[in-house]
Amino acid sequence: MEAIKGSEVNVPDAVIAWLLDGHGGVKPLQDDAVIDKDHPCWLHLNYANPESAQWLTETPLLPNLVRDALAGESLRPRVTRMGDGTLITLRCINGSTDERPDQLVAMRLYIDERLIVSTRQRKVLALDDIIHDLNEGSGPADVGGWLVDACDALTDHASEFIEELHDKIIDLEDNLLEEIVPPRGVLALLRKQLIVMRRYMSPQRDVFSRLASERFSWMTDDHRRRMQDIADRLGRGLDEIDACIARTAVMADEISQTMQESLSRRSYTMSLMAMVFLPSTFLTGLFGVNLGGIPGGGWHLGFSVFCVALVLLIGGVTWWLHRSKWL
């Protein structure tokens, strides 16, 4: 493939415009730079920026379909070969376990042996690892190494997020053993996070597997082996997600049963209290009718005797309930 001049890809509002030096480091992209297989360019754009959007629309370096895809709507992870280049859509984790990952951060890539064009709207935190390594001189030396490192960083962030969700599930299970019911919405949010992760990480694993099996000219056998390891690692994460989803279903049943048992205990307690005080309520109501005068109303000990009788009656009913094993 022919070399590219630096001026053709030097976008003023680019997030990153670097030239890989082939030794794990980078240098700023200059207009007179020569971009080729040995010194590829990484151009990282925010397609919401005006000049970046204009470059994506007008540059002849990208196929027409690629231009639309790099600045288009979010899609599920996929990989598509287009001539000498490859279009890749990936998803990454940015937030914490307390946020709703309804839409994971999308990152779109177009890669050939000379050029890496990555686009996003929200910041991709996983790329910070690659940026740090490149600044330290220990980053990828070529296009294939860059892609493997990027996929590895994305998978690391996904694995950490899955591990955090797993720890939260363990805490909820421990609380349920002590009959501590989580606040309303906590379990629903957890299930939502797991389902969204499952939705996007499953096709992303397939993308990694395909990248490992495709014979791209800019990927070595070592790159393919590492990519397959990444796919296998993400596959184990998906197995963990499936197990967590099943455990949340069990917890939902357990919470429902716990709430039902709590309601039943309260209803049972109220019923017993009604049984204990029902005879005394009947007597006080009967005496209070007062149609022919209250019995014992003229006796100075009448009220005291009546109170003692009520206490004995309540005690007798309580003893009977206890003997009948209702208490």
From Swiss-Prot:
It comes from the Bacteria. Keywords: Cell inner membrane, Cell membrane, Ion transport, Membrane, Transmembrane, Transmembrane helix, Transport, Zinc. Its main location: membrane. The keyword Flavoprotein does not apply. GO terms for cellular component: plasma membrane. InterPro entries: CorA_cytoplasmic_dom, CorA_TM1_TM2, MgTranspt_CorA/ZnTranspt_ZntB, Zn_transp_ZntB. It is a multi-pass membrane protein. The chain crosses the membrane at residues 274-294, 301-321. It is found in: Cell inner membrane. GO terms for molecular function: cobalt ion binding; cobalt ion transmembrane transporter activity; magnesium ion binding; magnesium ion transmembrane transporter activity; zinc ion transmembrane transporter activity. Residues 1-273, 322-327 are cytoplasmic. It catalyses: Zn(2+)(out) + H(+)(out) = Zn(2+)(in) + H(+)(in). Gene3D superfamilies: CorA soluble domain-like, Magnesium transport protein CorA, transmembrane region. CDD domains: ZntB-like_1. Pfam families: CorA (PF01544). The keyword Cell membrane applies. Residues 295-300 are periplasmic. Zinc transporter. Acts as a Zn(2+):proton symporter, which likely mediates zinc ion uptake. Belongs to the CorA metal ion transporter (MIT) (TC 1.A.35) family. This is Zinc transport protein ZntB.
